[in-house]
């Protein structure tokens, strides 16, 4: 069975779509998965916005991950939950899509994306335009069959503590993974939101050992992805405590390919209530 629209697709119904302007969709998290990280909730919002922008451009272009000014982690999504996805687009043209969005579970926000910008690429370079059009029509009509997603393969990294609130590590993009069949069929690329989730795990020890805690991750600011990550690519990971100010703190985390930075973000922390 093909992994397309199964291994990394997180919109299974479009409830309404004013193409290129606003969209409301939903996604039911399968009961069978062990977890559904908040990074994948953010992915769901982005995919919902992408559907509206692709339809507005007659499926000749599609967006890829670029910049998110603010990602807020407001809650948790569990297996069996139904995500309601909302996105408002302020731009959808051949150059880029700009949008903000939110995911809800039972009228409670789980994640918010603010001021996101995704560059557009030619659809035919990454996927079959007609196949994506048919997928959109299915979502807009009866919706896709639920429970197609079976979880994401574990992705490992090597990490060493550098001292003084710093950490270094290395990560190799898998050579093979089911999600490459969905992201994307014609040009496999490691998803930016999986890198986001990896970064949060990478700096987990920095958060635990940070003075003034215990701390909770409440979001990420200035999230930037500068280049594609093909199968087998080796990335260096770097994390460093940025600021500790009262009940708030932040950690800078980035990845590099050689001497060139390929992604960066500021992880925002808030002191946990005891």
Task: Set out the residue ranges of the language-model regions.
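Non-catalytic linker/capping segments at the edges of enzyme domains
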Residues: 1-36, 60, 77, 90-96, ...
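Compact, glycine-rich, soluble single-domain proteins
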Residues: 33, 37-51, 185-188
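Acidic helix/loop or adjacent segment enriched in Glu/Asp that either coordinates divalent metal
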Residues: 45, 195-200
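Hydrophobic beta-strand-centered segment that forms part of the acyl-chain substrate-binding groove
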Residues: 49-86, 111-112, 117-118, 200-238, ...
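Soluble ligand-binding/transfer domains with enclosed cavities or grooves
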Residues: 85, 103-104
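Short beta-alpha junctions and helix-cap segments that line functional grooves
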Residues: 99-100
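Long, positively charged binding patches that form subdomain-scale interaction surfaces
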Residues: 181-183, 195, 209
